[in-house]
C-alpha cells in the first residue's frame, strides 16, 4: 500500500476461484491524479495493513448486511442467512462452486470473519448497510432451485430446506429489474439481455 501511495503504480494477479489460486500474467496499473484504489477483502480493515500509511491517505469502509427482515410474527430472514444466500448465488455463477460446497465452507467463512473482520469493524470510518429490502424477492428465484438440488441424505439438507422456507415467504421479483449498477449485481451477475 505504501508503494501504491508513493509511486501510484501497482500490479495485481487474476484469481481463479475454480482452481483456488492466482493465474496468468500480472495486470499493471498506473493511477492518475484523481484516481483511487479500493482494497477489498477479509483483511481490508486490519490495522497491520494500514498503520504505516500516511494520515488521511485512506478511508475505511465496513460493508455488510446489518439488519434482519421481520414480519409481524418475528424474524423472516437473518442478516447471516441473507449473506449465505448471496454467497450461494454468487459462488455457483462466479466460482463454479456448488451450493452444497458453499454450505460446507460457510462455518469456516464465519470463523474467518470472527477472527479477521469483526474485531476491526469499529475502526472503519464509515459503515454501509448493504441490505436491499427487496433482495430476498430477487434472490429466491435463483436460490430456491439451487437449494432444492441438495439431496435429502446431505448433511446440508436441513439448512437448505430452512433457507428455502424463508425465501418462499417473499414474492418473487425478476432479477432483470435490478439496476446494472446495484451492489446486488456482485451476486446475481450482469443484466441478461
PLM features: residue spans?
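Cytochrome P450 C-terminal beta-domain/meander region
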Residues: 26-29
Amino acid at each position: 500500500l505504501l508503494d501504491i501511495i508513493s509511486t501510484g503504480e501497482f500490479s495485481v494477479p487474476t484469481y481463479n476461484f475454480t482452481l483456488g489460486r492466482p493465474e496468468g500474467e500480472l495486470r499493471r496499473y498506473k493511477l492518475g491524479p484523481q484516481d483511487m484504489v479500493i482494497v477489498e477483502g477479509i483483511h481490508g480493515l486490519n490495522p497491520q495493513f494500514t498503520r504505516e500509511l500516511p494520515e488521511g491517505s485512506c478511508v475505511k469502509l465496513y460493508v455488510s448486511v446489518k439488519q434482519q427482515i421481520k414480519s409481524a410474527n418475528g424474524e423472516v430472514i437473518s442478516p447471516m442467512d441473507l449473506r449465505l444466500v448471496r454467497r450461494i448465488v454468487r459462488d455457483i455463477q462466479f466460482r463454479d462452486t456448488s451450493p452444497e460446497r458453499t454450505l460446507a465452507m460457510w462455518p469456516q467463512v464465519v470463523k474467518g470473519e470472527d477472527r479477521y473482520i469483526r474485531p476491526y469493524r469499529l475502526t472503519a470510518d464509515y459503515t454501509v448497510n448493504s441490505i436491499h429490502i427487496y433482495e430476498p424477492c430477487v434472490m429466491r428465484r435463483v436460490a430456491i432451485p439451487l437449494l432444492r438440488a441438495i439431496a435429502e441424505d446431505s448433511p446440508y439438507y436441513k439448512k437448505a430446506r430452512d433457507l428455502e422456507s424463508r425465501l418462499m415467504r417473499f414474492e418473487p421479483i425478476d432479477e432483470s429489474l435490478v439496476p446494472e449498477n446495484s451492489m446486488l449485481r456482485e451476486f446475481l451477475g450482469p443484466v441478461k439481455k
